Amino acid sequence: MSVKFIEASDEDAIEISQILEDWAKSNHEIPLAHNNDERADYGRWLLEHTSVTMIHNSSGVVGFLALEKHIIQGLYIKKDFQGFGFGQAAIIFAQKQFEELRLWVFQSNIGAQKFYQRLGFQIVEKSDGEDNDYRLPDIFYCWKST
């Protein structure tokens, strides 16, 4: 697997918005709390307030990682590229930058829970989702370098 990490620029906003839109459409258990314009706004917010890294393979963009210091605000891999190690490579990329990483995962997203636990993340707390946009129960994870 060939993977490159390239710092995102304003020109990546459309690609980020499309990845977010595709994610929202493919996750049927998660209600569409945001319309396409709101997801585009969120993509722009990520570019302005976090460090966004585009994940590339030999044919182009396969996803992105958004970090706000040591907090993972988003790791999105296009559906056709999931299961090929791009997400794991992105986490390893982030782990090389920080001694601790934190993130929230929806409790309904069993695949993501298994993914992060396999990479050494530990559950810190569970919530009823009152504080997230989707109002879905979620889990707060933390990884610490050993």
Identify the meaning behind each predicted range.
Residues 80-81, 85-93:
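Conserved acetyl-CoA pyrophosphate-binding loop and the N-cap/start of the following alpha-helix
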Residues 72-82, 105-106:
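A short, internal acetyl-CoA/4′-phosphopantetheine-binding micro-motif in the GNAT/acyltransferase core
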Residues 102, 106-113, 119, 125-146:
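C-terminal "cap" of GNAT-fold acetyltransferases
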